């Protein structure tokens, strides 16, 4: 599911890129796509921890491209990012093993930031919501990086 959600986000970004060319965003999207491909390969090879790390990095790169390309409606941009980070957190919660205490602690930090981001968005505090969303994504990435190290 994590790879599917990553692919959906990349498809959305490629459509946005067609409307709003941006070399930096295109490079981020290409790197994200490569990471998702790597995640698929690692999953097929039975290397789940490495796959989690690669998929999360791919989605993080995609979110960076999202911030670059989504210059229109700020509320919609932040809302989509909050949704994407929420999906990332859901997937990580499922994929992290029961023995992953340190990773789960980072995941809880990410969830706390994400919850605050969603509340800030609902309150119309878009700058704060964006900052908290970025903090949530960074904590999720740290959890995945810890999961990827044996």
Q: Which residues fall in each region the model found?
A:
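Long, charged/polar, soluble alpha-helical segments
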Residues: 1-150
């Amino acid at each position: 599911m994590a790879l599917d959600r990553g692919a959906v986000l990349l498809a959305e970004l490629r459509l946005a890129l067609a409307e709003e060319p941006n070399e930096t965003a295109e490079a981020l999207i290409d790197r994200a796509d490569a990471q998702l491909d790597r995640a698929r390969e690692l999953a097929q090879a039975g290397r789940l921890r490495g796959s989690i790390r690669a998929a999360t990095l791919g989605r993080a790169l995609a979110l960076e491209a999202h911030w670059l390309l989504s210059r229109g409606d700020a509320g919609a941009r932040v809302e989509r990012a909050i949704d994407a980070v929420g999906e990332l957190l859901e997937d990580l919660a499922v994929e992290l093993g029961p023995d992953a205490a340190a990773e789960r602690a980072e995941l809880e930090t990410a969830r706390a930031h994400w919850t605050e981001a969603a509340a800030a968005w609902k309150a119309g505090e878009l700058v704060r919501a964006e900052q908290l969303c970025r903090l949530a994504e960074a904590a999720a990435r740290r959890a995945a990086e810890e999961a990827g190290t044996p």
